[in-house]
């Protein structure tokens, strides 16, 4: 055979071999090497998650689960593990984990009573979300004990510690007048909540009479259209107000029967705080002249409980005000926008966010978005970071103590993130997110069922 023909045959063979190899890969492509790397343990978790996600209650929802081992390797990620979803209150873990690292567990909020050089007595807020009416009474007593007898000027509130508006632009209008949507001010009091009482009518559909609010917002006009609902129908009231406003609208229903109370947000907490403080001072004999004059400086300071204890409570009841005040304080201390400061903290800890929308510190904004993968990585970084053991302890226990986690929930959204302890003592970090969830079933019971099954499959 001539050399030319031999060469041609060899080339033909190579081309044919290359075509069949390409065709085989096209039909059976190799798994991608970018993104999340699934460890060999994924198959049992895949089956567990798919069986769970196929339940009729979840068939219309977007569901995702991510599991990380103690080294941060991805043990399992469901199909939506790298898709940004609404986190609800699990977003609080970005705030609280960063707070442990940036502020420290012993950080305390300070509220001061200062007699200024213009003669005014100033209640200077430090953003303490836990300041109470009893704390204001104690501030008054301390100031009187320090010799305060007369104020040449007036009593004023200084809330300038936070530059951000007290109510986030992304919070729902229907949330901000209700207790869980209370704004975050430099001067807060009683968690910025009031108890609003109504007297139902004799028949369903009758107007319900507005009785009182406690504490009573000063100089406030109430526009009440609440009516009487069926007996046992519960709290159907929504309150509408604006920060610093003097008009509160109440709509909805209260159940027929005895007087019924609902919780609402104070529209002007600094005004309520100064009114209460002035009353306490006047009861102690302090006179207010209301004229320019001289002051004597700082008279009293109230310090909050340590931050770690506030975070314990914040996680336990998912307190939006406490989370937002901590978030804004991180920004104040760092000298940056709070979202930038919190994000930067986690990025320095090795969390590479994709698709993150961090609009508040509490998760109340529905426009917040985070990938389940990133939510899990934040929690692992928090456990590994400064005071990680204290952070772990602050999360709510369940499943016989084998789970430590922060839950999140709002209409259509259920989420969960934290740590799952296996029978061999290893600890997985997890993030479970469900968006588009319906009503009429116990999601948290299903959540417990899933985590118990994951724990069993890990052995």
Task: List the predicted regions and their residue ranges.
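Hydrophobic membrane-insertion alpha-helices, especially the h-region
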Residues: 6-18
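Residue-level preference for non-acidic, small/hydrophobic
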Residues: 72-73, 92-99, 155, 187, ...
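Small-residue-rich helix-loop
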Residues: 75-78, 302, 317, 324-459
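Short active-site loop at a secondary-structure junction
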Residues: 78-98, 102, 311
């Amino acid at each position: 055979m001539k050399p030319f023909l031999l060469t041609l045959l060899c080339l033909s063979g190579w081309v044919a071999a290359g075509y069949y190899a390409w065709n085989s890969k096209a039909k059976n492509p190799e798994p991608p090497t970018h993104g999340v790397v699934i460890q060999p343990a994924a198959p049992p978790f895949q089956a567990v998650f798919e069986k769970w996600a196929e339940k009729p209650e979840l068939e219309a929802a977007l569901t995702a689960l991510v599991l990380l081992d103690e080294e941060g390797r991805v043990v399992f990620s469901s199909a939506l593990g790298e898709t940004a979803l609404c986190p609800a209150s699990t977003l609080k873990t970005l705030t609280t984990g960063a707070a442990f690292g940036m502020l420290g567990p012993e950080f305390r909020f300070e509220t001061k009573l200062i007699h200024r050089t213009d003669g005014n007595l100033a209640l200077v807020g430090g953003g303490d979300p836990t300041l109470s009416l009893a704390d204001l009474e104690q501030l008054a007593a301390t100031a009187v004990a320090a010799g305060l007898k007369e104020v040449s000027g007036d009593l004023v509130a200084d809330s300038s510690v936070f530059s951000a508006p007290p109510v986030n632009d992304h919070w729902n209008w229907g949330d901000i007048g209700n207790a869980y949507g209370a704004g975050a001010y430099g001067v807060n009091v009683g968690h910025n909540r009031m108890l609003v009482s109504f007297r139902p009518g004799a028949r369903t559909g009758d107007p319900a009479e507005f009785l009182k609010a406690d504490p009573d917002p000063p100089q406030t006009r109430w526009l009440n259209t609440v009516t009487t609902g069926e007996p046992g129908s519960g709290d159907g009231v929504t309150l509408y107000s604006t920060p610093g406003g003097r008009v509160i609208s109440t709509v909805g229903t209260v159940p027929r029967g005895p007087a019924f109370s609902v919780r609402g947000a104070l529209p002007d907490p600094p005004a309520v705080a100064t009114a209460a403080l002035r009353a306490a001072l006047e009861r102690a004999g302090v006179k207010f002249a209301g004229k320019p004059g001289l002051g004597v400086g700082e008279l009293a300071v109230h310090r909050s409980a340590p931050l770690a204890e506030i975070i314990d409570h914040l996680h336990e009841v998912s307190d939006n005000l406490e989370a937002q005040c901590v978030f804004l304080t991180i920004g104040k201390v760092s000298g940056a926008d709070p979202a930038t400061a919190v994000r930067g903290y986690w990025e320095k800890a090795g969390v590479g966010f994709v698709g993150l929308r961090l609009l508040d510190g509490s998760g109340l904004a529905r426009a917040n978005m985070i990938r389940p993968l990133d939510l899990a990585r934040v929690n692992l970084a928090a456990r590994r970071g400064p005071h990680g053991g204290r952070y772990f302890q602050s999360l709510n226990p369940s499943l016989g103590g084998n789970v430590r986690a922060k839950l999140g929930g709002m209409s259509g959204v259920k989420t969960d993130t934290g740590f799952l302890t296996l029978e061999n003592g290893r600890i997985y970090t997890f993030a479970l997110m469900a968006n588009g969830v319906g009503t009429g079933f116990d999601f948290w019971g299903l959540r417990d069922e899933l985590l118990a099954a994951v724990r069993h499959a890990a052995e």
